[in-house]
Amino acid sequence: MTERWTRERRMEQTRTVLLDAAETIFASRGYAGSLEDIADAAGYTRGALYAQFGGKDALFLAVIERHRQRFLDGFADVMASFDRFADVDVEGFAERWRLLSGADAQRAAALNYEFTLFLLRNPDARDRVAAQRRETVRSLAEYIAKGIARLGGSLKIPAESLARVLLATNDGVTLASHLDGEDLYRTFLQLVLSSVGPPED
């Protein structure tokens, strides 16, 4: 039992290190980043990479899936940090949103744009991740609906529509803020919060 547990932990650690390296390479070099570079950065062989993921497409999609889950977890934490909608401070909310993508928001946004380009250029991959994308929207919409209800507000538009807009625009706000040197998070959140009203009777 101990041997099996150790083997499983070792495989899990290998997978995590490979994903970390792949995320760095894909964000800095795009999908064109080579498997050799990823394996070297992780300190493993290409054989270990293939054993874990089977190929480049599967590795890239695994990186994106992990990144999306981090975003969802972070969003849930942001929503949980407020008790009432009336007490939501836009500046504080904007700061939390700014940190939502992690320590390197620009890299995270670049990775998401690379993923979008990958799907546009690879219809087969788009079909493979369609269910994952729907689940991301569904999960985010659920967080939004439950969070707004808990805060004592109501949505003026469907939660799923707002979720799609957030996913579609968040990376653009991040990159534009970085490239233009102007913080757009506050303005962005003012637009988002305009879709929230008082509780329904």
Language-model region placement:
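Hydrophobic alpha-helical connector segments
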Residues: A62-E65, F75-A109, A159-L166
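Helix-turn-helix
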Residues: Q13, V17, A21-A58, A62
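Short amphipathic alpha-helical elements of helix-turn-helix/winged-helix folds
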Residues: A21-I25, S139, T169
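N-terminal intrinsically disordered/low-complexity leader segments
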Residues: M1-Q13, D201
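Short, basic, alpha-helical segments at the C-terminal edge of helix-turn-helix-like DNA-binding modules
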Residues: L35, E65-F71
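Amphipathic alpha-helical segments used for helix-helix packing
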Residues: D89-V90, A103-D127
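Short, solvent-exposed amphipathic helices
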Residues: R107, R128-E135, S139-E142
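Hydrophobic/aromatic-rich alpha-helical bundle segments in the mid-to-C-terminal region
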Residues: R126-A130, R134, I148-D201
